[in-house]
Structure formats: structure tokens, C-alpha cells
Amino acid sequence: EEISVVGFGDEGWSELTYPPLTILKRDVEGLSRRAVNMLFEKINTGHVIEQDYYADVELIIRKSTRMLDNGPFGEEAATPESIVITKEEKSRLRAGNFRVAISFHYTGTSWAELHEKGIRDELEQYGIDIISVTDAHFDASLQNAQLEGIRLQKPDAVIAIPADDKETKEQFRELAKVSKLVFLSSVPENMEKNSYVCCVSVNEIENGINVGRMMGQYCKGKHVEAGFIIHGAVFYGTRARDEAAEKIISEQYKNIDIKAIRGFGEIENAYQVCKDMITENPQIKVLYVSWDRPALLVIKALKEMHREDIAIFTTDLDYKIAQYMESGIVKGLSTQRPYEQGRTAAHVVAKSLLSNDVPKYVG
């Protein structure tokens, strides 16, 4: 049960095994079409296309894989599919007039928008109302004030991401007295295990490892000096991600020399942190940035310094960062699945409104 198994190929039987097999599915049809087009090109024109083509590969996740990360109290991660809502429970939910609030650490990104859409789409199935959505702008004091407002509304449940794992803990403890709490990605420090329902999380360690490996592949065969622009705040998700990226570079890619590691704390500080780092370490050729929003400010700083030769690796996908991937300054990116995570959190909330039989950690 502790071993994950991944298959390569798209054979039909992989879905029929127990458990169903997670696979890397190649776009064989697309590759075949390209081959036929090249053949007809040669027949019709005599021109031989000398170009390498690669089949696209899609990761289809099924139940043969499990998260390596554990919850705040060492819990193994349960799969979203393990939480089942019966027809009878659906009817009870629709008749229950339940109310839910959402407290985001910050919004204004595709990541947050997709989380909210996933939550809304899932809760709508059960007739559950969303009575408020707050944006703390990564300000713990502001989130505490917003949580007090939510507490006075007395929703049946709250889906929340703490802006700061330490500074918000007392307010979340008060909120837990009147509402069921489901956390996304992070649980405030020293929250008692029985004071919240569940933490729904992506594997941030794997997220960081993915970015580190992309950096390693990019720098393969050459000595490169790198800089790490990390979050540096009391926030579990980014801390786990940043540490994992740094660790895999240090342990597995000895050709990459990490010259500087600096935290920006608040997003707007990433611009100056980058400028200072590159001014002091002009030999840096590769930068890790904790996620896309600060990465956009790092790109702005690099452009002003005429250092677009520096390759950037980051996490989370938004329209602007995708444009920079196309132009080439962003060389690698690992992203979560925010819509699915939002739906899972809402699914957990719906189940918890009727039952205490909910896993403590889902991912």
C-alpha cells in the first residue's frame, strides 16, 4: 500500500486492474499523423523533412499512486475518490440550507479563480450557498479581521487558506467553535487535531522537486551558478516547496552552485530582492522563484537590468507567466491542479456537514 506504480502506454487493460493503473499516455495517433504527413510531403515534393518530432505525453492519475507527503499530524493522504456522498446524503444536503464561507490568503490570480470556481461548481450540486469570499492580500491582520466577520455570520463551514500559519491561529481557533473548518494546503501552527475537519493539499514537496529537476536538466553538463528567491514566510506550502527544490539541487546536481538564497516575504519585495541578488552575484545564470506572481516581478527587474539571459524556473500557471514561457525567459514550471483541489475541498465540506467520517488529510 505504500508503493506507487506508474505504467507507460495507453493499453485498455490499465484501467481495469485493481487498483486502476496510473499511466503516462503517449499521443501515438498524433505522432502517426505527423509521420503520414511527412511521407506525403516526400511523395508529392521530393522534399525530406529532417526534423525530430516527439509524442506528447499525458499523465493520467488513477489509484495506483499515492502522495508521499503526510498531514500535519503524520496522517497518510486519502484520495478524493475515497470520500463518497450517497444519493440519500445528496438529498439531505439539498434540504439542509447549509451556508459556507471562503477565506483566501490572496486572490487576483488564475490559481485562486480556479479554486473558487471548483468550490462553487461542487457546492452548487448540493444546493449549498456561499455567503462570503474574502481576500486577505497575504496580510495576517487583515485575515484575522475578516475571520471575525465570518465568525459573526456563523456559516456551517469555512474553507480557508491561512495567510500566516502563526499569526492567524488564535482567530481560526475561535472560528472552529462555531463552524467546521476545511483548510487548503496549510494548517495554522498548533491547531488541535480535533478542532478542524480536514486539510486538502497538493504535494508541495513534489512540486518543488519537479522544479529542481527541471533546473537540473536545463543545466546538464555544465557548471552553473544559481539563485533562489524563496517566500521566506511562515507558510507551510511554500516552505515545503522551496526547501524541496533546494534540497534536490544540492543533493543530485553538484554542477549547480547555489550562490544566494533570499526570501521576499511579501510579493512586492521580490522585485528588489532580485535586483540586489543579481547586483551582488552577476554570475548567476539560473533563478528559482517560489511561484508565478513574484516571478513576474523578478522578470521585470531582470528586464530593467538587461539580464534576460537568466533562466527562470517557478511554479503555478497564469496567463502572463505562460506568455513568458513562450518567449523563453521562463524555462520550466510545475503547477498544481487548483480547480480539482477546489472541488475536492468542497466535496469534503459537503460530506462533513452530514458525517464525522472524513479523512484528516486528503491529496
Each language-model region and where it sits:
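An alpha-beta-alpha
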Residues: H47, Q51-M67, V100, F104-G108, ...
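Signal peptide-proximal N-terminal region
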Residues: R120-V133, S250-Y253
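Hydrophobic alpha-helical
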Residues: E1-S14, G30-F40, L59, R151-K177, ...
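Flexible loop/hinge segments that line or gate small-molecule binding clefts
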Residues: G9-L21, D165-E206, Q217, E225, ...
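Flexible loop/turn connectors
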Residues: E1-N70, H306-G363
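Hinge/beta->alpha junction and helix N-cap segments in small-molecule ligand-binding domains
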Residues: E1, F8-E11, K25-R34, Y54-D56, ...
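Immediate post-signal peptide segment of exported/extracytoplasmic ligand-binding proteins
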Residues: P80-V100, C219-H223
